[in-house]
Amino acid sequence: MYELILALGWDLLLGEPPAVVHPVVWFGKLIAFIDSHYSRRSPAIDFLAGLFATLVVLSFAFLLSILPLYAPYPLNYLLSVYLLKSSFAIRSLYEHVRRTMKDDVEEMRKEVSMIVSRDTSKLGREHLISASIESLAENTNDSVVAPLFYYLLFGLPGALVYRAVNTLDAMVGYRTSRYEYFGKFSARLDDILNFLPARITVLLFLPLNPRRVIRYYKMARFKVNSDKPIAAMSAVLGIWLEKPNIYRFPGRDPRMEDIERALKVYVIVVSEWILLLLLGVIL
């Protein structure tokens, strides 16, 4: 339990460790190295190469997670807390989303582009606000609920391996000519691992507007985990959230102050999750 409490305290008080010593950054560099050194071939070979890349990255994550077992006291305790903290990002997510609140549209586009994969160069203010809030909702699962869910189930290996899978999906899990087959295995694995956490995230939104959250949840695409927390956030805020030509949850037009409202919802949801985690560890 000390490990979880200290890791949460580190995150809330200090935020992220420097990139040069951040395990998730290491995962990203390893993925980028493998990706850049593999020349695409046939679909079958690309799929096998992607499978191999996934196994390499997950093996690295697992080896990192067991380092504390072989470290001397008290380094083992410090390593455990440090590695667990690196698997989730409560404060960092809050700060990144808050920085998108810019009066100047061009500045806002730049900030939003840092937290979403879509092209923001031609998005209007309402769609920029929507994209910012969508990212907050989706990453409430990916960066907070899911890694700590797998920590609760499998300890430090669960948290770091999940984070490695999520990083793989974020980097190569796209349906493009380059990644369609190379990223398929890691994308499907990410879908499987996020199935339960995404729905747990929705349950955390439920007390804020039960009837509407349930109604919006039913609108979300069944097979797409990321839709679920976005639908829940849209329901609670009462605004439309939209990725053009992909999905749209109904409501009034989003306004700048809705980002602030979304951040308050995020604080409530994360607080609920932390409380449940601590109760789970105690019991």
Swiss-Prot record:
The keyword Transmembrane helix applies. Its main location: membrane. Keywords: Cell membrane, Cobalamin biosynthesis, Membrane, Transmembrane, Transmembrane helix. The chain crosses the membrane at residues 5-25, 47-67, 142-162, 263-283. One of its GO terms (biological process) is cobalamin biosynthetic process. GO terms for molecular function: ABC-type vitamin B12 transporter activity; threonine-phosphate decarboxylase activity. Converts cobyric acid to cobinamide by the addition of aminopropanol on the F carboxylic group. PANTHER family: COBALAMIN BIOSYNTHESIS PROTEIN CBIB. This is Probable cobalamin biosynthesis protein CobD. It comes from Pyrococcus horikoshii (strain ATCC 700860 / DSM 12428 / JCM 9974 / NBRC 100139 / OT-3). The lineage of its organism: Archaea, Methanobacteriati, Methanobacteriota, Thermococci, Thermococcales. The gene is cobD.
